């Protein structure tokens, strides 16, 4: 029955002659998803025990099932009343099916000798024909697989056997023999032939050309796989599981043979070797140098004068910043006491003014304004010193007003927050850079994509691209419809025996 199904290339369910159409439909529904029965018959199952006596095990409908999910063939017996699987036997390699009687067929099971006693000899005849046809196709396919690896290797082996030393010895021998006697010349040729046979008998890379490390049943031998082939498979994204898979490894092996063999693939791979990757770009540009690197650190506190009285609360201010840099301006040192809280910022004024005078040497008689306030970030450099304005927060010039200044500092609430837009414009390039650092939001962010170069994409042409295309077609066929699967699995069983997913 299976031979009649060759034109459509898809096996259809074949029911039993003794069952009604409704019973056959029920039987087909018990087979399972993507399972097809190639022949069905009503049988009794017998098994031979150790005492060599046949004993009946069960009765039901025997089916020669093509199990596409498991990619194998089984003999299964179903109970159509309860819809249960009663027994099964996989058609292993070298499976032998005997028919001592037309209605009584025997074979070796996994644990004992098994027999099928058919209720109808016509069904028995058709069932036997379906099984023997299947076993014959599998046998022919196995023979072709055994002969395939040895076929294309003969011319390749003769091409690879090249020994420049042999030609050198031949040329050298001819010169010597031209001088010697004719008999000595013949002896020299005989010795030369023995040397040539020894060299030819041990070619360097004949083994790799011979079998490629591939077996029809187990796939590629990963332990003895050629490193260049392994590199090719890695470039194409072929996993070890795919190399061990019987069907996928067969597709890969056929691709290598169609390309010209292992040496042709290796030569093409060397020719298409990608250029070295460009040097990786550096990360983001280094941040600007810290402000203190461009100027000297603040001088230590001097011992002149008495320090101002401490405030009533715990000091929380940061250490005084280094003085700002202005060309042509003498910068005053910071206040002597580091525990002294920062004075309030002075309001900017549009009137030009000279640089601030040096700090007072004593608590009395001082008329100079305080040093410039620090910026909001503690480690940042201070803005240029502001100029006093005519407002209420003008710094007093007398020593009597010094106490009022301290009271304002202690109150804290009257201190004005320094806004970004209220900073005076710096007059030098370095001050402008410091202002940008303090503002922060004006700095350009560096994207993470610039830190590392993207990986070099795999080549999509040549031998690598062709193999990748073959594997993509194979993957699409596995996950596509049954019709697509028939095309890719044609290598497993020819004619109508492709697997279906």
UniProtKB/Swiss-Prot annotation:
Residues in domain WH1? 31-138
The primary location reported for this protein is cytoplasm
Q: Which residues carry this modification: N-acetylserine?
A: 2
Provide this UniProt record's keywords sorted from A to Z.
Acetylation, Actin-binding, Cell cycle, Cell division, Cytoplasm, Cytoskeleton, Methylation, Mitosis, Nucleus, Phosphoprotein, Repeat, Transcription, Transcription regulation
Q: Give compartment(s).
A: Cytoplasm, Cytoskeleton; Nucleus; Cytoplasm
Q: Which domain of life is it from?
A: Eukaryota
User: Which named protein is this?
Assistant: Actin nucleation-promoting factor WASL
Native species of this protein?
Rattus norvegicus (Rat)
